[in-house]
Curated annotation (Swiss-Prot):
It comes from Actinobacillus succinogenes (strain ATCC 55618 / DSM 22257 / CCUG 43843 / 130Z). This is Small ribosomal subunit protein bS16. GO terms for molecular function: structural constituent of ribosome. One of its GO terms (cellular component) is small ribosomal subunit. The lineage of its organism: Bacteria, Pseudomonadati, Pseudomonadota, Gammaproteobacteria, Pasteurellales. The keyword Ribonucleoprotein applies. One of its GO terms (biological process) is translation.
Length: 82
């Protein structure tokens, strides 16, 4: 099954997440199919906190991909802001 989920990057105690489309059997930070955005929970000032390609997310959901809980909340946040 294909899921849209967060993949952790960044330094120790300073997380930075890529929003990726991946097979649910692959490791959290492992192989992915497509990168559809990023999420920076520690963004301050003019730094961009969240970027998401909603067209690609919707295309993957139409193909049967499921959203993780956190990504689902982020998608709703982007849709509310738009």
């Amino acid at each position: 099954m294909v899921t849209i989920r967060l993949s952790r990057g960044g330094a120790k105690k300073r997380p930075f997440y890529q929003i990726v489309v991946a097979d649910s059997r692959s490791p959290r930070d492992g192989r992915f199919i497509e990168r559809v955005g990023f999420f920076n929970p520690l963004a301050t000032g003019k730094a961009e906190r969240l970027r998401l390609d909603l067209d690609r997310v919707n295309a993957w959901v139409e193909k049967g991909a499921s959203l993780s809980d956190r990504v689902s909340a982020l998608v709703k946040e982007v849709q509310k802001a738009a």
